């Protein structure tokens, strides 16, 4: 019988089992597919230090430590703010890698119990306004209640309406109140700038509740 091997399996280098019969693969794949990650973002990510980003050696070390202990990070209700003025130097990749790792450790036995989500903040704000494809109440509930959410490119725009602000504030505030872990990525490195874009109430809930790690290396795009 021909073995059903998936070339995109996260364990392909260390496993020879039939993916079609693998409970681990099935449960991890379900988490990935329902998290909001694109297929390209579901693939394993390799991050490394080279001449372009050698300035980030300590930041990579700190991020690697969080990633290696991501279950403790979530269980301790911690938040993370990964920021950089540079584009393409690993902010989003690190956040996704942490979400992958959390799924790896916690997906087993959690089939159809969503553990984490990835959200492009700009897309979310656009969906708040899209009456043809509105954000469902279930989606909002999941954003407020899953163990770990990645808000990618938070504060990427200053053109945020009061309605958008209220929706975003409510989700983030409820996560903080419920002691749910959140990872933010942003090109805003200073609190004062974040406050100008999002206002003090939301900026405080994002920045002051998070461990802040700044990347300064050049982008690879």
Give, region by region, the residue ranges found by the protein language model:
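Loop/turn-to-beta-strand initiation segments
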Residues: 114-115, 145-148, 178-184
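Short glycine-rich substrate-engagement loop in P-loop NTPases that contacts/grips substrate
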Residues: 56-64, 83-89, 99-146, 158, ...
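A short, basic N-terminal segment
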Residues: 1-68, 212-213, 217, 221
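Surface-exposed alpha-helical segments enriched in charged/polar residues
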Residues: 64, 68-71, 100, 173
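Conserved catalytic network of the ASCE P-loop NTPase/AAA+ motor domain
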Residues: 73-74, 108-111, 141-144, 173-179, ...
């Amino acid at each position: 019988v021909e073995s059903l091997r998936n070339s995109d399996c996260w364990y392909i280098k260390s496993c020879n089992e039939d993916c079609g019969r693998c409970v681990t693969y099935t449960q991890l794949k379900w988490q990935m597919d329902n998290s909001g990650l694109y297929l390209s973002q579901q693939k394993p990510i390799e991050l490394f230090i080279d001449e372009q980003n050698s300035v980030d050696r300590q930041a990579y070390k700190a991020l690697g430590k969080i990633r290696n202990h991501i279950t403790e990070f979530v269980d301790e209700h911690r938040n993370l703010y990964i920021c950089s003025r540079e584009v393409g130097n690993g902010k989003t990749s690190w956040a996704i890698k942490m979400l992958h790792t959390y799924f790896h450790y916690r997906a087993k036995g959690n089939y159809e119990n969503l553990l984490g989500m990835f959200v492009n903040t700009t897309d979310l704000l656009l969906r708040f306004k899209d009456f043809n494809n509105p954000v469902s109440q279930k989606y909002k509930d999941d954003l407020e209640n899953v163990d770990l959410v990645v808000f990618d490119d938070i504060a990427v725009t200053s053109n945020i309406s009061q309605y958008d602000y209220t929706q975003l504030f409510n989700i983030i505030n409820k996560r903080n109140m419920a002691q749910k872990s959140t990872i933010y990525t942003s090109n805003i490195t200073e609190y004062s700038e974040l406050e100008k874009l999002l206002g003090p109430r939301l900026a405080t809930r994002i920045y002051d509740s998070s461990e802040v790690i700044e990347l300064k290396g050049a982008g690879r795009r």
